[in-house]
Amino acid sequence: MAKKIVGYIKLQVPAGKANPSPPIGPALGQRGLNIMEFCKAFNAKTQGMEPGLPIPVVITAFADKSFTFIMKTPPATVLIKKAIKLDKGSSKPHTDKVGTITRAQLEEIAKTKEPDLTAADMDAAVRTIAGTARSMGIVVEGV
C-alpha cells in the first residue's frame, strides 16, 4: 500500500548550503520531518552545482514522518542575471533598460530550463525565456 501524503513543502534552497536554520528548519519541523537528513541529502545531490545557486525543491511529507524531494532547475531570472553579469533587474522594466541578452545566451538558458518548461519545442522555450528577460528590463536581441 502507498504511503499517505500529509503535504508538500516548496522551498528555494541555495545549492550545497542547506542547513537547519530558517527557512528550512521551521518548514520541515512543522511536519515533524528529520531536518538534518534532508540537509545532508540535498547537499549531496547539489554537490556538483555552483554553490549558492538557488534551487527550487518540492518536498513530499508522508504520514510516517518520511519524505522525498524533487529538485527543479534554477529560476530563469537567476540564470539570466548570471548570463549577462547583472546584480538585479530594472525597477522600471519598460522604461529603464539594464542590459542586453543574445539569442545564443537565451538558447543556453532554455536548454538548462528544458525539463521544467512546458514549451513544445526549443524555439517556444527561447521565447518564454526572452519574455522573462524583457520583464526584467533587458533588451533581447535576435528573437
From Swiss-Prot:
Which GO molecular function annotations are given, in alphabetical order? large ribosomal subunit rRNA binding; structural constituent of ribosome
Cellular component per GO?
Answer: cytosolic large ribosomal subunit
- SUPFAM superfamilies cross-referenced by the UniProt entry: Ribosomal L11/L12e N-terminal domain, Ribosomal protein L11, C-terminal domain
Q: What's its job?
A: Forms part of the ribosomal stalk which helps the ribosome interact with GTP-bound translation factors.
What is the name attached to this protein's record? Large ribosomal subunit protein uL11
InterPro entries per the record?
Answer: Ribosomal_uL11, Ribosomal_uL11_bac-typ, Ribosomal_uL11_C, Ribosomal_uL11_C_sf, Ribosomal_uL11_CS, Ribosomal_uL11_N, Ribosomal_uL11_N_sf
Q: Which residues form a coiled coil?
A: none
The family assignment reads: Belongs to the universal ribosomal protein uL11 family.
Modifications after synthesis and translation:
One or more lysine residues are methylated.
Q: Please, which domain of life does this record's source organism belong to?
A: Bacteria
Subunit field text = Part of the ribosomal stalk of the 50S ribosomal subunit. Interacts with L10 and the large rRNA to form the base of the stalk. L10 forms an elongated spine to which L12 dimers bind in a sequential fashion forming a multimeric L10(L12)X complex.
Asked whether the keyword rRNA-binding is assigned, the reply is: yes
The record's section on CDD domains has: Ribosomal_L11
**NCBIfam families in the record, alphabetically?**
L11_bact
Please verify whether the record's keywords include RNA-binding.
Answer: yes
In Gene Ontology terms, what is a biological process of this protein? Answer: translation
Q: Which UniProt keywords apply?
A: Methylation, Ribonucleoprotein, Ribosomal protein, RNA-binding, rRNA-binding
Q: Which gene encodes it?
A: rplK
A Pfam family it matches: Ribosomal_L11_N
